[in-house]
């Protein structure tokens, strides 16, 4: 503090300075974080007191055969947890209020987030719990899902015709129980990718990408959760990404109800890259995008010469043979795909 005192003139003999320091305390309250930067401008008048600690689950994503109790917790005191089971994103006003352990007895895609007034909420955590005994006999359209896709009959169910089911399971002599057991084993034989999103992102008549498969570009990209589950049924990886329909003639639902899709990993959703060795130890362990091909030219939708004529492996075999001969070739693998808990 500096005091500057002046007398009347340089010849004046009287000079007195009697400063008084008066201070006022302004209670600014608790420190706050600003979620929106305002360089060169006043701070955002809002701000947050802190961040809600991430949600924790007592049971991780994966395969299950028996019912279990699922507990969800956050270390932040007096925080509220909300969850959904229909693929939608929980908010402070949307979703079930978590009050205690939840009984999980069937295939469930559960999304949860924690909230507290004045705090930044958690991100949305997604957990897919897949009961393969039920998946193996998956029924028709779930409640709220359309019975037709852009004028084409929707196809959600497993083909449970005993003869076809046995042959698809690997042996025409299988009993229904044996075919079901073999199907369950097959569902555990290769990696699983579970995609979870708002139902309307897929099936809204005007904006859903599955009902408007000709839509291209970022305007037809929808946010999704992506989970990778290993053959042993243990969850390996989860991130959020963008999802688009891809292909040319394969976009036609009259040709195939099983559309090709593409996952795009971007920072605006979650991880900027998929950081997981999806194609095995010899393949890359980082991906900007992944194509999920339905392989319509060599699958059940194009078995024009009869049931069982498709090989399913022709395209991938050709790529691997090309690569093994020292030539450039795209890498690929096989995986089971689920959309909002439904086997696809």
Question: Where are each of the predicted segments found?
Answer:
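Short glycine-centered, acidic/aromatic-flanked micro-motifs in structured strand/loop junctions
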Residues: 5, 85, 294
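Short, compositionally stereotyped local motifs that mark structural "simplifiers"
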Residues: 14-223, 228-239
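Extracytoplasmic/secreted cell-surface and envelope-processing proteins
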Residues: 11-13, 301
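Conserved ATP-binding subdomain of kinase catalytic cores across diverse folds
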Residues: 195, 201-202, 208-344
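A compositionally biased, intrinsically disordered/low-complexity signal enriched
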Residues: 3, 102-104, 290
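Short beta-strand-plus-loop segments that form exposed binding edges in beta-rich domains
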Residues: 3-11
């Amino acid at each position: 503090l500096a005091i500057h005192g002046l007398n009347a003139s340089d010849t004046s003999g009287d000079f007195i300075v009697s400063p008084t320091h008066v201070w006022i305390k302004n209670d600014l309250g608790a420190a706050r974080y600003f979620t929106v930067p305002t360089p060169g401008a006043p701070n955002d008048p809002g701000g947050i007191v802190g961040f809600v600690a991430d949600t924790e689950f007592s049971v991780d994503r994966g395969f299950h055969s028996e019912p279990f109790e699922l507990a969800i917790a956050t270390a932040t005191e007096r925080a509220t947890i909300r969850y959904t089971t229909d693929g939608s994103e929980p908010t402070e006003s949307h979703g079930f209020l978590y009050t205690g352990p939840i009984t999980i007895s069937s295939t469930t895609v559960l999304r949860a987030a924690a909230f507290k007034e004045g705090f930044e909420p958690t991100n949305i955590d997604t957990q897919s719990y897949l009961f393969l005994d039920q998946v193996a006999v998956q029924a028709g359209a779930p409640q709220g899902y359309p019975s037709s896709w852009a004028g084409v009959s929707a196809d959600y169910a497993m083909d449970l015709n005993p003869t076809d089911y046995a042959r698809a399971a690997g042996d025409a002599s299988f009993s229904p129980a044996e075919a079901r057991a073999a199907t369950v084993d097959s569902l555990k034989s290769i990696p699983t990718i579970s995609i979870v999103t708002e139902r309307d992102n897929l099936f809204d008549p005007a904006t859903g990408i599955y009902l408007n498969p000709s839509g291209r570009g970022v305007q037809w990209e929808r946010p999704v959760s992506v989970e990778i589950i290993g053959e042993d049924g243990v969850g390996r990886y989860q991130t959020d990404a963008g999802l688009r329909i891809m292909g040319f003639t394969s976009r036609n639902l009259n040709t195939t109800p099983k559309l090709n899709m593409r996952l795009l990993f971007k920072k605006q959703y979650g991880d900027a890259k998929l950081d997981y060795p999806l194609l095995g130890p010899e393949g890359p362990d980082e991906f900007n995008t992944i194509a999920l091909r339905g392989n319509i030219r060599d699958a059940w939708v194009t078995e024009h010469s009869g049931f069982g004529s498709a090989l399913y492996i022709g395209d991938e075999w050709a790529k691997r043979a090309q690569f093994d001969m020292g030539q450039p070739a795209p890498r690929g693998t096989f995986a089971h795909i689920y959309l909002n808990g439904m086997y696809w």
